[in-house]
């Protein structure tokens, strides 16, 4: 759900920044827009799909792949937060015609900053539980093997 929200926010920013008029001070094109930062929501969607699949069909390889995609989501989120903070800390002059669009774009970045934190906490929590589940499954397999070897 959060990933779909990020994709819609990217589309909103695309429409918003495409409507800018070239003025004396130029247009506002933040670094998060240039890098397609909100398009990285695709990683969050993929992580959700993997999570649902592992919940229905828990296999070791599924848990490992979900753990890997969640780690990718964590790295993506940290990168997105860093780029958004850099964007929000610097505001160059723009044409007065584009000021409203730039201001609205910065507000969208602030909203996304909150959702990046939410996605980070979800991915981190699920990664921790995946690691503990893998460790527990490995211990269960070891104990079953030891029991089989100890019976004559």
From Swiss-Prot:
One of its GO terms (biological process) is cell surface receptor signaling pathway. Keywords: Membrane, Transmembrane, Transmembrane helix. One of its GO terms (cellular component) is plasma membrane. Pfam families: CD20. It is a multi-pass membrane protein. The chain crosses the membrane at residues 1-21, 32-52, 66-86, 111-131. Its main location: membrane. It is found in: Membrane. InterPro entries: CD20-like (IPR007237), MS4A (IPR030417). May be involved in signal transduction as a component of a multimeric receptor complex. Belongs to the MS4A family. PANTHER family: MEMBRANE-SPANNING 4-DOMAINS SUBFAMILY A MEMBER 13 (PTHR23320:SF42), MEMBRANE-SPANNING 4-DOMAINS SUBFAMILY A MS4A -RELATED (PTHR23320). This is Membrane-spanning 4-domains subfamily A member 13. It comes from Homo sapiens. The lineage of its organism: Eukaryota, Metazoa, Chordata, Craniata, Vertebrata. The gene is MS4A13.
